Amino acid sequence: MRKQGHRSRAAVALLTAAVLGVTGCDAVGGDSAGPTQTRKPSPTPTSAWDRSPGSIAAVGDSITRGFDACSVLTDCPEVSWATGASTKVDSLAVRLLGKTKAAERSWNYAVSGSRMADLSTQMAQAATRAPGLVTVMAGANDACRDSTAAMTSVTDFRAGFEDALSVLRKKAPKTQVYVASVPNLKRLWSEGRTNPMGKQVWKLGLCPSLLADADALDAAATARRDTVQERVEAYNAVLKEVCAKDERCRYDGGAVYDYRFGTDQLSHWDWFHPSVNGQARLAEIAYRKVTSVT
């Protein structure tokens, strides 16, 4: 969910540094598998899904890289919901593997700014590890374009996802895949627009198809945002359908899309990407879905 040029980077850095000051990240994880107050469901011999994978690789975009969660216009993978080591997040990898094994047996191949068409390259990298589980969170950048006309078509989105899974299956046929739904971008607009600084950052080119003229509520602006919303919902339908055809793939059932991100879960740098708190909520959702009996 990132799209800025060098001039925008400089402008955002000056703006956010002046208002907030740069913050850091806690990169120390817990030493035991699973969150403190969370108990895994009892194993079931009838399920083909392994709820305790021994290694994890992550693919996707800036959300999985922890972009803007720790400081302005910077990736912060230590707070990634999928593979981060921060105790403030308690990532999926740490919950499943514990701190020590997560550091040795989890890899983050996500790239900020990636769209679905870029996922095959990341999957090829992940496949070389033959991980027990690959996490996928991609699609926001396909909707976040300069205009609604420039959004990735549903057909191309489907082809990109199918190709990415095909690449993985050729090299790692037994690897399981957890697919997170694309977040409800329109809700992020609704929450973020309440912050004056956030709207100033948005003017510098963040997700123009949705966030341009953030305060405009006329028919044209409403129709534009509805178009983005409908495309995101179509992307999620594709993720569900394609994943259902792979017996080792598990879609989150729209859990990320349905999650009601509030201002505490949004980056205080751009009011659009997940904050550290938001990353923790994504980790909770993923852990619940990966360890679910069904």
Each model region followed by its residue ranges:
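N-terminal export and membrane-targeting signals
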Residues: M1-A17, R231
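C-terminal motif of bacterial Sec signal peptides marking the signal peptidase cleavage site
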Residues: G21-G24
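Serine-esterase "nucleophile elbow" of acetyl-processing enzymes
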Residues: G29, A33-W107, A126
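Flexible, glycine-rich phosphate/dinucleotide-binding loops
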Residues: R65, R115, K186
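C-terminal or late-domain output modules
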Residues: V72-C76, W269-T294
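Functional beta-strand-loop-alpha-helix junction segments that form "active/interaction loops"
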Residues: E104-M116
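Structural motif
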Residues: S114-A124
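Alpha-helical cap/lid subdomain in secreted, periplasmic
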Residues: M123-H268, V276, Y287-T291
